[in-house]
Amino acid sequence: MLQKIMAINAGSSSLKFQLFSMPDEQVITKGMIERIGKQDAFFSIQYGEQKHRETFAVENHQQAVDHLLSALLDHEIIKSLDEIAGVGHRVAHGGEAFSDSACIDAAALQQIEHLGTLAPLHNPVNAIGIRAFMEALPHAKAVAVFDTSFHQTMPPETFLYALPYRYYQEQGIRRYGFHGTSHKYVSQICAEKMETPLSDLRLISCHLGNGSSLCAIQHGRSVNTSMGFTPLAGVMMGTRCGDIDPSIMPYLAKQENKTADELNALINNESGLLGISGVSNDYRDVEQAAKEGNERAQLALKMFAERIRSFIGSYIAHMGGLDALIFTGGIGENSRTARAAICHALEYLGIALDETKNNANETFIQQDSGPVKIAVINTNEELMIARDVMRV
């Protein structure tokens, strides 16, 4: 029997949604509400061939949810709220408490809020969105889908930092990893397209966007990932520096009299492609500047690709080989030059890009003789959320 399942991604001032027919995985409607808390909040919704946009005042997430549900009725997308059988919520951090998506009850919601200490910008807002939908749709199944849970299969020798062990025991300091929903989804799709059981494959998923992370996936399980305790760690990103020598922070604090908050802003908001190029955090803008001869933009692109190649080599060693390299995310899916730069000089590892296939945006872009598949797969975190609502 078909069911209507809603996937929700609540941000500090936004609410993105998709309503699916499941299990046939058809999108019924999608849209978002932006500028929550403002007098000129913006609502957009798309269904069939119709698009509707409006501006109105929204004080909080509860009002945003109420407006969204009213719009579904007003536009006759549904006849009754009872038609919505379940709601899946993207939640940033599940810590060690959640190794999989979970049905939300009072105890689970309290745990999500408690984990706000690890994700203060995200978990509290995620919890607000959950409460708003649970109040508006008390009959509907509520499921939390965590960015971190896919990586809970990493072994301790991989997820622990070489700090005194008590900091892990008392403060939960360890590698958690993020983008798990995306990495999980594209690994499943890649296995389907390769017509090979996921349990037989060694994959590296490269989710590349303004935030970027890599994930080593062996037998369908995450065994390593580039992001760490926070989404700052790993490769160079739009405004985040990725891995650096930690001693740089106390050095800058002393030399430039910077506070902890100022240093945090520096490495999260002022670094990466933006910091090196001086042009933009948007890969497309940096790419254009590089074409026009901007040497710092050219350097930023080289650094971006080099950091990713280093992780690819490390993960191949970790898994003892590689069956497929996956590109996803805004950059991974859309920038043929980024894919080419990353794969450059990796032929000795079996990663041989076919330039014609890459430029044609085909799904598999490796040379015919290449032993490692190179796949370009559009991520769909909302669909993965809807699938998990049906599964758990």
From Swiss-Prot:
Its EC number is 2.7.2.15. Belongs to the acetokinase family. PduW subfamily. CDD domains: ASKHA_NBD_AcK_PK (cd24010). This is Propionate kinase. Keywords: ATP-binding, Cytoplasm, Kinase, Nucleotide-binding, Transferase. One of its GO terms (cellular component) is cytoplasm. GO terms for molecular function: acetate kinase activity; ATP binding; propionate kinase activity. The gene is pduW. It comes from Tolumonas auensis (strain DSM 9187 / NBRC 110442 / TA 4). PANTHER family: ACETATE KINASE (PTHR21060), ACETATE KINASE-RELATED (PTHR21060:SF15). Pathway: Polyol metabolism; 1,2-propanediol degradation.
